[in-house]
A protein has these predicted regions:
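N-terminal pre-triad scaffold of radical SAM enzymes
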Residues: 34-66
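Flexible, acidic/Gly-rich N-terminal and inter-domain linker regions that tether
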Residues: 1-43
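Auxiliary Fe-S-binding modules of radical SAM enzymes
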Residues: 219-351
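Conserved alpha-helical substructure of the radical SAM core
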Residues: 41-47, 68-100, 110, 117
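Conserved AdoMet/S-adenosylmethionine-binding subsite of the radical SAM
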Residues: 85-88, 92, 108-253, 257-265
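A short secondary-structure junction signal
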Residues: 60-64, 73-77, 185-186
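Residue-level recognition of the N-termini of beta-strands and the immediately preceding loop/turn
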Residues: 98-100, 130-133, 170, 271-275
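Short acidic/polar capping segments at secondary-structure boundaries
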Residues: 54-58, 68-72, 105-108, 140-141
Length: 351
């Protein structure tokens, strides 16, 4: 019975925390007229995420992908929107936004002619607050032919050039999970062609048990990325969704891997930050392990926060070598982390 199989599968999916960090409850914005924009997220002041409905698939279906609800056919769990005009209107209503991140799925699944409809709408609006367009994509590593031999490869690159020539910074947020992904000639040529448009490529990846939990590999990967003209950006902690128990790396171990790799690279690769958790309060950066008044603690800070005043404030958790997520940590001093009361007051649906 296909219906029964689908029902059971969906029940299991709903148990896997499909929208961690309050994405569906807290991040969905609305226009001043009350229209909910379910194809967008606005968690941090300066940046909004846009999910074009045509990009809700991907070149790769990574088992560790935290965007898996976009792919499984449960429409009520999807973020998707067709209206570029509503994106423009929202940016007009929110002058604090400087960056728009196209995400999915993968925006580079779209034909160039369709993607340019969205980017042209942004450029034609001449929004004074829009400084950067970001594109989150796995295509550079998984399907470099998008920029080489696909029927719309040249059109894609011309669109990139158009964005750059408009005075808008274009950042390709490329997902590279392992050094091996940088080894082929098509990858290298795709990177070269993208950079020739004036776009910058910033690289990021989660730290994954069984795949890339090796400091030497990370150091070599960052070095190779720099040699190809890319900018190492983030090492993420696997999110609390899907197969986290398989791919997750304890935070203490993750920080040690990051620190060991960081020490092996020159300053040009030290643009990278991590390990970082995209949790409900914001991007939580694991700074390391220390000792305060004889107590061993994990030192953390927020790189981004739902409230900008939270950013950069150090806070401390009791040392726990098994913790793999913020929710596993206990405050080292006092009963709560410094942001918890405000989080509960302003964001009561999940806090």
């Amino acid at each position: 019975d296909k219906k029964e199989i689908a029902r059971v599968a969906n029940d299991i999916r709903l148990q896997l925390n499909p929208h961690p960090a309050g994405q569906m409850e807290l991040n969905v914005p609305q226009l001043k007229d009350g229209t909910k924009l379910y194809g967008m997220q606005h968690k941090y002041d300066e940046t909004c995420l846009f999910f074009p409905s045509q990009s809700q698939t991907c070149h790769a279906y990574c088992t560790f992908c935290f965007r898996w609800p976009q792919f499984v056919g449960m429409d009520e769990m999807k973020f998707a929107m067709r209206e570029g005009e509503q994106l423009v209107q929202y940016l007009k209503e929110h002058p604090e936004i400087s960056d728009v991140l196209f995400t999915g799925g993968d925006p580079m699944i779209m034909k160039a002619s369709m993607f340019s409809v969205y980017t042209d709408a942004l450029l034609d609006a001449k929004l004074p607050n829009l400084k950067t367009i970001r594109i989150g994509t796995k295509a550079v590593s998984y399907w470099p032919y998008k920029f080489l031999t696909d029927s719309d490869a040249d059109e894609t690159l011309k669109n990139f050039e158009k964005i750059v020539k408009s005075g808008t910074h274009l950042a390709i947020m490329a997902h590279f999970n392992h050094l091996v992904e940088l080894s082929t000639d098509p990858i290298k040529e795709a990177i070269k062609r993208i950079r020739n448009t004036g776009a910058q490529i910033r690289t990021q990846s989660p730290l994954l048990a069984h795949i890339n939990d090796d400091a030497d590999m990370w150091a070599k990967m960052w070095q190779k990325q720099v040699s190809l003209g890319c900018i190492p950006y983030y090492m993420f902690v696997v999110r609390d969704t899907g197969a986290q128990q398989y791919f997750g790396v304890p935070l203490v171990k993750a920080e040690k891997i990051f620190r060991t790799a960081f020490r092996k690279v020159s300053g040009l690769a030290r643009t990278v930050r991590g390990p970082s958790m995209s949790a409900t309060p914001g991007k939580v950066h694991v700074l390391g392990v220390s000792e305060i008044n004889g107590q061993k603690v994990i030192v953390l800070q927020l790189l981004q926060g739902r409230e900008s005043e939270w950013v950069g404030v150090p806070f401390f958790a009791k040392y726990d070598e098994n913790a793999i997520w913020l929710d596993d940590l206990v405050p080292a001093f006092g009963e709560k982390f410094f942001f918890e009361d405000e989080l509960k007051t302003k964001y009561t649906k999940t806090a």
